[in-house]
């Protein structure tokens, strides 16, 4: 999988502070380290939820059998009129009377503008649609996919500026005495007020009717970091977009999940720019998830595609999976949703091509990162949280060590992983990652990984690590083994760990980034005395 480097923080004049001040600052900063919370898993013992949301239900593979989707905890199709799924995707024609202007024909649908559609009429129809697509209240994901206009006026740039132009025309037709500047201001106010009402009241209705599902809007939050052609692209989200996301606090307050998207274009194929793009978008989603309450963050389910957005018949290569999935997992999200269109399943040939891609490239990699992440969470967090990067903006990945492990596709079509982790593998976890504890759980990083005596973790379809470890013991206070409940009564035996190389510059404890902050304080403390 290639070598991945780890960037480390350079410490400045930390020694300028007295020992007492260092101690005081450390104690002040420790709570900020321990406050890095994540939402608990939707399904117990499934810290990383894999969701398949593509129309493959009629696909037949090379063995004349349906595609094997057993790896995914939730499988659903975005086809219309399919009801009672664990993931429900509401397009513009499936939830109420969403007002928009058809981007292809220019046709006005339901008034075209939120100012011109009766909200109560929309909500009555939305109620019917929710009860139709979700006949029972069960645990699942409810995603509203409204992309035609954005609730933030300024973000409706070309070609969505038609909503701004039509809104201005509406105000001028109603109030011809207004000058242009005032008409624009009124149009902005009216558009944002009614757009907010449409999105917010629809969200509240969904939560009231089906409270067990996690409700949110697809592509929210976004950070518009697609400036790939700029020199020295680093993937950062423009500061103005962070502020605009802050201004959507009303939306985050009533969402029960976030559904950002990190679809890749061929412009970043096999390029580090793809990793930077994904990394920063996910990091912004994590920031937004904590705006309302950093101790009770919203769960985040990231949408990905298996193909490029501008080349819908070209599958992502392994490098691109590393730059997407590989970036998402160590940042610490609740799950990943794989979305696909009919282009994946338009013929028998395309179905067989998808099956071959899944068996040869996709599933081995997903198994890799899933078990690595779960093992890290068990070893370092005792299953009370998930492993996340100590420094989010580095190339450290939760991968198996290719020297110690091998994922094999057996003749029966099932995967098995051979090998077991070395002490060095577990030490890599401790060097590069720390625990982000689940909400309302007090956990801390395990530092004595040499005392780990066994690992036991599984994927949802029971591809398991069940290994007894025989590391030299440095202490007599060995702890009992930690087990994964999902591995009970399973026959598969496998092992996995991280592939990030060791670095002598990484601090041996999980306070490295806090100490970095401390170093900043130390450099400026003398000016405060």
From Swiss-Prot:
One of its GO terms (cellular component) is side of membrane. Coiled coil: none annotated. InterPro entries: Aldolase_TIM, Glycoside_hydrolase_SF, Hyaluronidase, Hyaluronidase_PH20/Hyal5. Residues 1-35 form the signal peptide. Glycans are attached at residues 81, 165, 179, 253, 368, 401. It is found in: Cell membrane. It is an enzyme of class 3 (hydrolase). It comes from the Eukaryota. It is a lipid-anchor; GPI-anchor. GO terms for biological process: carbohydrate metabolic process; cell adhesion; fusion of sperm to egg plasma membrane involved in single fertilization; hyaluronan catabolic process. It catalyses: Random hydrolysis of (1->4)-linkages between N-acetyl-beta-D-glucosamine and D-glucuronate residues in hyaluronate. A lipid is attached at residue 492 (GPI-anchor amidated serine). Keywords: Cell adhesion, Cell membrane, Disulfide bond, Glycoprotein, Glycosidase, GPI-anchor, Hydrolase, Lipoprotein, Membrane, Signal. The keyword Disulfide bond applies. Testis. Endoproteolysis (toward the C-terminus producing two disulfide-linked fragments) could activate PH-20. Residues 478-502 are annotated as: Disordered. Gene3D superfamilies: Aldolase class I. Residues 487-502 have a biased composition (Polar residues). It holds the Pfam family Glyco_hydro_56. Residues 493-529 form a propeptide. Belongs to the glycosyl hydrolase 56 family. Involved in sperm-egg adhesion. Upon fertilization sperm must first penetrate a layer of cumulus cells that surrounds the egg before reaching the zona pellucida. The cumulus cells are embedded in a matrix containing hyaluronic acid which is formed prior to ovulation. This protein aids in penetrating the layer of cumulus cells by digesting hyaluronic acid. PANTHER family: HYALURONIDASE (PTHR11769), HYALURONIDASE PH-20 (PTHR11769:SF20). This is Hyaluronidase PH-20. It comes from Cavia porcellus.
């Amino acid at each position: 999988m290639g070598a991945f480097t780890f960037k480390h923080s350079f410490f400045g004049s930390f020694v300028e502070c007295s020992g007492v001040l260092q101690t005081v600052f450390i104690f002040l900063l420790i709570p900020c380290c321990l406050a890095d919370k994540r939402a608990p898993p939707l399904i117990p013992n499934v810290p990383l939820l894999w969701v398949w949301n593509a129309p493959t239900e009629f696909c037949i593979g090379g063995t004349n059998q349906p595609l094997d989707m057993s790896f995914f905890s939730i499988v659903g199709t975005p086809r219309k009129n399919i009801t009672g799924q664990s993931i429900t995707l509401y397009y513009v024609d499936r939830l109420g009377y969403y007002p928009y202007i058809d981007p292809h024909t220019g046709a006005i649908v339901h008034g075209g503008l939120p100012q011109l559609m009766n909200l109560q009429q929309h909500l009555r129809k939305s109620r019917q649609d929710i009860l139709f697509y979700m006949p029972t209240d069960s645990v699942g994901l409810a995603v509203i996919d409204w992309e035609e206009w954005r609730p933030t006026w300024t973000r409706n740039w070309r070609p969505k500026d038609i909503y701004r132009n039509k809104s201005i025309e509406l105000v001028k037709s109603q109030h011809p005495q207004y000058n242009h500047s005032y008409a624009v201001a009124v149009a902005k106010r009216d558009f944002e007020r009614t757009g907010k009402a449409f999105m917010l009241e629809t969200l509240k209705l969904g939560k009231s009717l089906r409270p067990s599902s996690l409700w949110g809007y697809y592509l929210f939050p976004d950070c518009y970091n697609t400036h790939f052609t700029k020199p020295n692209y680093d993937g950062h989200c423009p500061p103005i977009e962070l502020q605009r996301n802050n201004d959507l606090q009303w939306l985050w307050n009533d969402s029960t999940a976030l559904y950002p998207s990190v679809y890749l274009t061929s412009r970043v194929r096999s390029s580090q720019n793809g990793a930077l793009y994904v990394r920063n978008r996910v990091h912004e989603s994590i920031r937004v998830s904590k705006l309302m309450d950093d101790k009770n963050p919203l769960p985040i389910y990231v949408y990905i595609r298996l193909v490029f957005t501008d080349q819908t018949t070209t599958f992502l290569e392994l490098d691109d999976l590393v730059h997407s999935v590989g970036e998402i997992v160590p940042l610490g999200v609740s799950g990943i949703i794989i979305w696909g269109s009919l282009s994946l399943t338009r013929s028998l040939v395309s179905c067989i091509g998808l099956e071959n891609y899944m068996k040869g490239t996709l599933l081995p990699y997903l198994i890799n990162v899933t078990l690595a992440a779960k093992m890290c969470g068990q070893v370092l967090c005792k299953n009370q949280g998930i492993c996340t990067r100590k420094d989010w903006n580095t190339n450290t990945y939760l991968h198996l060590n290719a020297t110690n492990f091998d994922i094999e596709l057996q003749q029966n079509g099932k995967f098995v992983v051979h090998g077991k982790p070395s002490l060095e593998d577990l030490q890599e976890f401790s060097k590069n990652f720390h625990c982000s504890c689940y909400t309302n759980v007090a956990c801390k990083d395990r530092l004595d990984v040499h005392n780990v005596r066994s690992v036991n973790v599984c994927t949802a379809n029971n591809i398991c690590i069940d290994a007894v470890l025989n590391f030299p013991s440095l202490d007599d206070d060995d702890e009992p083994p930690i087990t994964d409940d999902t591995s009970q009564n399973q026959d598969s035996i496998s092992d996995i760990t991280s592939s990030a190389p060791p670095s002598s510059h990484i601090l041996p404890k999980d306070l490295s980034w806090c100490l970095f902050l401390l170093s900043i304080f130390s450099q400026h403390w003398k000016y405060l005395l």
